[in-house]
């Protein structure tokens, strides 16, 4: 590359006013350039293009976000029609069901005395306080009620999740939105939470009655396989890391990799973790195409996701 290739576009100074929209702010981030502003600018650009040009669009996120008010935004995103499949963790099901049933989560703080909280029967999730009775038991009761009502000896996880979503009346429910739009919610670690524990104990109860029950997890994988192999282009918005991130990029490697990938994360790559791995590492595994477009934004999703999604909506609805 020549010297001129490095000095094409100058940084611009900006001003803001109370009349600025989020779209205006994104444009100003693009002018600011340094440092995370440039990443937000690119994320909006890449995600907007990916949603427009792809016929298979993944939304992946971790459960902790569902314990916050971001749950409503995630439900809105599922209901928007811009995503074809959700990949997440069992905690998402737990928090969404619990809150949809009217059980409150409360504003707390990180520095709370955890011993006192434990004695008071209060769970702490970061700076969110959850009364013990508001979390596990109501989730397990509903899941078992749905299983009994269905009366099936075998069910796919995504089908069961839809059945639960069908019975929730909360407009802020992710599972309700997924059922309405028929967006499959894939939870590869479905036994890792109250929702999955309820399935296990239901199965054990049936065994005592001499009956069998099978959770057909491979049906979810078959569904993903069919979606990936029937697609022409794929895009993913990945919020957080862990199994929900890996399951998206894992399946896309079998079709040559994602065409578009946007990561929102707080994890770093120096420890070699999957959560911290950047899109460029995914290229070496065939999980992102070498010519694919990608962006990584470091920061708290409760701050970044509303800004990025508002910027994306402004772009895709304008196009």
From Swiss-Prot:
GO terms for cellular component: cytoplasm. Keywords: Hypusine biosynthesis, NAD, Transferase. It catalyses: [eIF5A protein]-L-lysine + spermidine = [eIF5A protein]-deoxyhypusine + propane-1,3-diamine. It comes from the Archaea. InterPro entries: Deoxyhypus_synthase_arc, Deoxyhypusine_synthase, Deoxyhypusine_synthase_sf, DHS-like_NAD/FAD-binding_dom. Its EC number is 2.5.1.46. The keyword Hydrolase does not apply. The keyword NAD applies. GO terms for molecular function: deoxyhypusine synthase activity. Its cofactor is NAD(+). Pathway: Protein modification; eIF5A hypusination. NCBIfam families: PRK01221.1. PANTHER family: DEOXYHYPUSINE SYNTHASE (PTHR11703:SF0). Catalyzes the NAD-dependent oxidative cleavage of spermidine and the subsequent transfer of the butylamine moiety of spermidine to the epsilon-amino group of a specific lysine residue of the eIF-5A precursor protein to form the intermediate deoxyhypusine residue. This is Probable deoxyhypusine synthase. It comes from Ignicoccus hospitalis (strain KIN4/I / DSM 18386 / JCM 14125). The lineage of its organism: Archaea, Thermoproteota, Thermoprotei, Desulfurococcales, Desulfurococcaceae.
